[in-house]
């Protein structure tokens, strides 16, 4: 498998050979779906909470007498049928949203995503990506010159200048290979990988 090598203007200067094990796999939609769903589920805080009929503030006094009013009988105002009453099946903060996915499946899913990106021309290689100062404008101008407005950069090493320059840019994310996730890979229109990061990705997902 070959992918484009981009210059500073975002133009293809040549092609580089990449590992078929990581970038030449068949597209497995169901596996990719599993990997992304598991990633999103495991990222949930699980802190949402609602109150049931015991937890809402209420009085145990009977709202009105049992008979003679023509209304349906009611025992207390905390009933889920009443405004301000508790939920029947409330969301509780101890709910576990964890989705287990095997390491082999995760590696295969990530490799399938990288392979599809390469086939679609959304994956490209750059020699390196550095900035001399932690200025957002410097990095923004660099991507503007490359005609990129939605890009995930996987760099072998993200120094302080690069991190500070990129963190305030919309639709730009710079990460190291170990922090690359399936959701970001499919979200951004273009994925740039430095040459050194390519070797790390091969070790991680081969």
UniProtKB/Swiss-Prot annotation:
Q: Which GO terms describe its molecular function?
A: rRNA binding; structural constituent of ribosome
- InterPro entries, from UniProt? Ribosomal_uL4, Ribosomal_uL4-like, Ribosomal_uL4_dom_sf
Q: Which family does it belong to?
A: Belongs to the universal ribosomal protein uL4 family.
Which key words are in the record? Ribonucleoprotein, Ribosomal protein, RNA-binding, rRNA-binding
Do the record's keywords include Ribosomal protein?
yes
Q: What does this protein do?
A: One of the primary rRNA binding proteins, this protein initially binds near the 5'-end of the 23S rRNA. It is important during the early stages of 50S assembly. It makes multiple contacts with different domains of the 23S rRNA in the assembled 50S subunit and ribosome. Forms part of the polypeptide exit tunnel.
Asked if the Swiss-Prot or TrEMBL record annotates the protein with the keyword S-adenosyl-L-methionine, the reply is no
Residues annotated as transmembrane: none
Subunit structure, interactors included: Part of the 50S ribosomal subunit.
Name listed for the protein in its UniProt record: Large ribosomal subunit protein uL4
Gene Ontology cellular-component terms listed: ribonucleoprotein complex; ribosome
In terms of Pfam families, this protein maps to: Ribosomal_L4 (PF00573)
**Basic residues: which segments have biased composition?**
58-70
Q: Which GO terms describe its biological process?
A: translation
Q: Where is this region: Disordered?
A: 46-77
Species name: Polaromonas naphthalenivorans (strain CJ2)
């Amino acid at each position: 498998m070959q992918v484009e090598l981009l210059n500073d203007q975002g133009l293809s200067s040549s092609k580089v050979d990449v590992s078929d094990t990581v970038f030449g796999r068949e597209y497995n939609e169901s596996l990719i779906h599993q990997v992304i769903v598991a990633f999103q589920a495991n990222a949930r805080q699980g802190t949402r909470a609602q109150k049931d009929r015991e937890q809402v503030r209420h009085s145990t006094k009977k709202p009105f007498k049992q008979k003679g009013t023509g209304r349906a009988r009611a025992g207390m105002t905390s009933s889920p049928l009443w405004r301000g009453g508790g939920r029947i099946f409330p969301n509780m903060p101890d709910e576990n949203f964890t989705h287990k996915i095997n390491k082999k499946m995760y590696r295969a899913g990530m490799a399938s995503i990288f392979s599809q990106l390469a086939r679609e021309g959304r994956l490209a290689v750059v020699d390196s990506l550095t900035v001399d100062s932690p200025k957002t404008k410097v990095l923004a101008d660099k991507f503007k010159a490359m005609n990129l407005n939605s890009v995930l950069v996987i760099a072998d090493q993200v120094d302080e200048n690069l991190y500070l320059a990129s963190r305030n840019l919309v639709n730009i994310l710079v990460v190291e290979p170990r922090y690359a996730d399936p959701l970001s890979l499919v979200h951004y229109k273009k994925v740039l990988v430095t040459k050194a990061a390519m070797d790390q990705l091969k070790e991680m997902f081969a």
